[in-house]
């Protein structure tokens, strides 16, 4: 539905790589030297170009072509990661997760909806908003998209820091 910033921020959709991993050099610094030798950056870039070659571009403007590119990359890469994580986390906790907007039929339909319908009046998710306009209160209908809730827990932060330090001190670990 076009809610992520790389759909509407030119500095993100104009990048010559996956926009959600634009800080790859910083991430690679976390890995140990043996893993760094694997040329991960080049591998990621080659997957990006391979994905671009898989896209069926329509006779569209440059602007719409970029949007189609972002939608395709989002479906094939970013959303796959989110769905895999959600699925494994829910299964671990014996919870059956439903993701109705990720159904094959909806995804295929939305892939072909022109961007002007998806991002209308400077507001993301326009198709979804319009579909539910008569059912939602105005304050929800007009609410800006916000990411999944984040919580702050000092106990959890301390736990994760200690776990990371333990992992980093393990010489057999790839980090």
What are these regions (language model features)?
Residues 1-6, 147, 151:
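Active-site donor/metal-binding and catalytic loop motifs
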């Amino acid at each position: 539905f076009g809610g992520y910033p790389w759909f509407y921020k030119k500095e993100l959709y104009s990048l010559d790589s996956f926009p959600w991993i634009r800080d790859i050099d910083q991430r690679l610094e976390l890995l140990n030297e043996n893993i760094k030798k694997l040329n991960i950056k080049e591998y990621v870039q080659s997957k990006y170009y391979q994905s671009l070659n898989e896209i069926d571009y329509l006779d569209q403007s440059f602007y719409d072509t970029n949007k189609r590119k972002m939608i395709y990359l989002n479906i094939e890469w970013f959303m796959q990661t989110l769905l895999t994580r959600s699925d494994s986390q829910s299964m671990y906790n014996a919870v059956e997760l439903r993701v109705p907007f990720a159904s094959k039929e909806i995804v295929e339909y939305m892939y072909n909806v022109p961007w002007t319908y998806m991002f209308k009046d400077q507001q993301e998710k326009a198709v979804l908003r319009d579909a539910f306009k008569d059912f939602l209160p105005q304050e929800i209908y007009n609410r800006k998209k916000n990411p999944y809730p984040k919580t702050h827990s000092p106990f959890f932060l301390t736990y994760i820091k200690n776990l990371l330090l333990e992992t980093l001190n393990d010489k057999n670990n790839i980090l």
